């Protein structure tokens, strides 16, 4: 197992030196010898790559849960356009009272884009809206996040997808 000394570096074998890495190039070699079959691999927008998604599903029999941002412009534009023009109630909502704030998370999921999106193995596209109130200052903030997962409706509902999304941040 590799244990980086700091983000963006890997130890050089048989040495205390470190070498710089590129997350996109190192993700597959890092996961190659790890049994992730049936597991969900979450990744931020940098790793939202077609080759990585295909490798996870076909070679490792794992699921992906990817954040979609502007580095995948066409994908991002399609998902944001769909949800920004999707006037329905959220599919699931949670409220947490931790870390000095009140945080409401709402998720909308859809399979309507699965065949349209130019991305392999999409089971759902989703949008998460976070409404955050700082209890001390009263300051309010609203954030939106968009993404895709390989989990199909038989494998995940809105609550599960929201849990996967939130779970991604437990490491950072």
Task: Map each language-model feature to its residues.
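Residue-level signal for helical boundary/lining positions with a hydrophobic bias
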Residues: 40, 168-169
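A short acidic (Asp/Glu
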Residues: 51-54, 76-78
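Phosphate-centric recognition/catalysis
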Residues: 172
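An anionic, glycine-rich sequence signature occurring as long contiguous blocks
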Residues: 63-166
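Gly/Ala-rich phosphate-binding loop of Rossmann-like dinucleotide-binding domains
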Residues: 57
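Alpha-helix boundary/capping residues
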Residues: 34, 165-168
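Conserved, well-structured functional cores that handle cations and Mg-NTP chemistry
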Residues: 1-52, 60
